[in-house]
Structures are given as structure tokens and as C-alpha cells.
Design a protein with these regions (language model features):
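Glycine- (often His-adjacent) and acidic-residue-rich active-site loop
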Residues: 1-24, 44, 157
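C-terminal alpha-helix plus adjacent terminal tail
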Residues: 2-4, 13, 101-107, 122-126, ...
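Generic structural signal for alpha-helix termini and adjacent loop/cap motifs
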Residues: 8, 32, 175-176
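Short C-terminal domain-edge/linker segments immediately following a structured domain
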Residues: 16-20, 70, 89-91, 150, ...
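Crotonase-fold acyl-CoA enzyme core
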Residues: 27-141
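Hydrophobic alpha-helical segments typical of transmembrane helices
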Residues: 21-25, 81-84, 93, 145, ...
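Alpha-helical interaction segments
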Residues: 8, 15, 56, 60, ...
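Residue-level recognition of specific faces of alpha-helices
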Residues: 4, 18-21, 28, 51, ...
Length: 187
């Protein structure tokens, strides 16, 4: 009995620690003053997909795909995706990704506004880096001030959503169902 209580306590502490780390990471993305660019040359799964609306540009290869298999794992949305996905993708597509675990192709992701540009897979690096260099050559001061204006009105709301999502994730990660689903998913 003591072993079970000790194990349960350890699982809860681990879930709390993971949730706090995730919350801090996502808060840093929300507050980051300089342009953030994501390059996706394969699968953007889970957090890798969920955080994309928090960056300023997403360049992907034609072979990329985007997936959030949360429900399959017994997990809930993260990285503010419960808020940003309906805004960016529309409610129907957000539901498909977050509730049904449907993956998006690169073309679907671009069509729905999750991706900025798609490049041929074999030329991805050169095209993506050309875009990154073009961004880097702009006035950094003007870029930061513009980003501040674009993000200011949603920062507080995003941080609140992040806080709520992480609290629920902490519960889910400590639940027996989610632990069983994780074990099954990994094996």
C-alpha cells in the first residue's frame, strides 16, 4: 500500500513538474520579442504542431504533416492550441485536429493558415533559409515594435489559456488512463 501511495505521489510530482516546464516554455514563446520562425521538414506532431500558431512564420516541405494525437493518448491540448487552432484554422478543422486526431498535409495546413509557405522537399533548406535571411535583413527595431503591436492584445489571454491548459494536462498526465495510453503508444 505504501509503495502505491509513493508511486502515485511520484507520478503527480512528475506531472506537476512537466506541466510547469511546459507552461514556462510556452510563456517564453508568447513573450519572445524577436521574430520566431519554424522550419518543418517532416512531421510536426503534438507540441511541435500545437506551438506553430505562436510563431511568426512557418515554412514546410511538401512532405510535411501536422498532427495532435492528444485524444488517443488521453491528453488534452497544449501550447494554447485550444485557443489558437480555432482562430487560425476555424472551428471545424480545429476539432478535427484536436478531437479526432486527424493529420493535415502541408497543403491543407497552408490552405487553413497554419503554414506560411511550402517548398519542394529536396530544395527545402535553401528556400527556407532564403526566407529566414530576408527576415533577418529587415530593421530589427521596427520588426520588434511591429510584433509587439500585433501580439499585445492577445498576450494576457494566451497566458491565461496556457495556464488553464497546463493545469488540466497535469491532471491528465497523472491519470491512470493516460499513463496506460502512453505505455501502449510507446510500445
Amino acid at each position: 500500500m505504501l509503495n502505491m501511495l509513493s508511486e502515485t505521489s511520484h507520478i503527480q510530482q512528475t506531472a506537476r513538474s512537466f506541466a510547469e516546464s511546459l507552461r514556462n516554455f510556452v510563456d517564453k514563446l508568447i513573450d519572445f520579442p524577436k521574430p520566431l520562425v519554424a522550419l518543418v521538414q517532416g512531421g510536426a506532431v503534438g507540441l511541435g504542431c500545437a506551438m506553430l500558431p505562436l510563431v511568426d512564420a512557418v515554412y514546410c516541405s511538401e512532405r510535411s504533416y501536422f498532427s495532435t494525437p492528444y485524444i488517443k493518448l488521453g491528453q488534452t491540448p497544449e501550447a494554447c492550441s485550444s485557443f489558437t487552432f480555432p482562430q487560425v484554422l476555424g472551428m471545424t478543422m480545429a476539432n478535427n485536429l484536436l478531437l479526432n486526431g486527424v493529420a493535415l498535409t502541408s497543403c491543407q495546413a497552408k490552405q487553413h493558415g497554419l503554414v506560411t509557405s511550402i517548398f519542394p522537399h529536396d530544395q527545402f533548406k535553401q528556400h527556407a533559409m532564403s526566407c529566414v535571411r530576408r527576415t533577418a535583413m529587415q530593421s530589427s527595431e521596427a520588426m520588434q515594435k511591429s510584433k509587439e503591436l500585433l501580439r499585445k492584445s492577445s498576450q494576457t489571454q494566451l497566458k491565461h489559456v496556457n495556464y488553464c491548459e497546463c493545469n488540466i494536462l497535469m491532471e491528465r498526465w497523472a491519470s491512470e488512463q493516460t499513463l496506460t495510453n502512453f505505455r501502449s503508444f510507446v510500445s
